[in-house]
Amino acid sequence: MKKYTFSFLLFVMSMLLVQAEQLHINPKTGNDNNSGTRAQPLKTVMEAARRVNLNKEPEATTIFLSEGIHLLTQTVVFNNDKYTLKNRLVIRADVMPDDAEWTPQKMPVVVTVAPLEPGVGGEEAKGIQPEVSHVTIKGLRFTGSPDYSYMDGTNLRRSYPIWRDGKNLDDLLITQCLFTGNADVLPLHVGVIANGYGLVIDHCVFFNCKIPVVFWKNNGETGSRSAMRYSLVYGGYFCGVWTTQGTDGDNFDFHHNIIASTSTVWIREKGSKNRYKASDCIFTDYNKLAGYGSGPLSDSDATATDFLEMKNVQTTGTIKIEKDQSKRNYLQLADGSIGSNLMAGLFKH
């Protein structure tokens, strides 16, 4: 009798362990009429989002993206706000940067070609829009959009690969992702822009992006800590990080980051009096260390740096980037570059 009882308990436990939604996407072999298993993958992220939004079961969700080019022909909105700190919505690569078999070619490439919509100061296209709390996005490569950014003297076309609008939302972790742009042909206006709380940028690389990340507005209540850590910003043609009056310096961590060959290192929302701390970082080859900004069309007005308490921050030296596409560290720090001790970049181990 004990044997059968034990077997039954094992069966129940195994059923509980698999109570999680998993969907696989392969842009080459997938079909949006498939079941979404690894053997029968979906074709588009849009279809995965549709299914996730319909599933009201209180369970975690993991969406696996295979290598290849994933075109977002419309904004992908996740609005099924059922997740918890433990049971998360995870959007991830099949193979992660720390896996032995990983190479840069294994990264799923997410390209936003969604129709532009009217926005403040021009038109904007949004890629992945998680309007839920407790989300992780990891191991993906995002590119700029093939838009002609200039409209006229007062308007721009802008792309946002990751956008979160809800000012009450919390806990958005972006980790081991690569954001690549080009000011002339594939402009990437902001890699990650998020209202709410708990935006964490971890082990990410931003290469030739106008603005890597904007820690945006919230509803004035309390939430989990926001952070930018172990990340590499190179060639930011506006700034390295943007904080607003809603970005509470006492609830914000900034450490082990490299910001190089960038116009302005740190932009604050115009009028902000918030103070911040930066530790164990390198800021080098910049035009201005700090400035104020007021919107997508504004230039930055240089400001004093007394708002920023810097501990063990290096401001000299040359950052070298690996440009050989055959190398595992492509678009990351080249071997022998200063800053290698900071572990900034895609690899955690």
Q: Could you say what each language-model-derived stretch is?
A:
Residues 65, 91, 136-137, 169-174, ...:
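All-beta strand scaffolds that present successive hydrophobic residues in beta-strands
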Residues 117-229, 234:
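Right-handed parallel beta-helix
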Residues 271-349:
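Acidic, glycine- and Ser/Thr-rich low-complexity intrinsically disordered tracts
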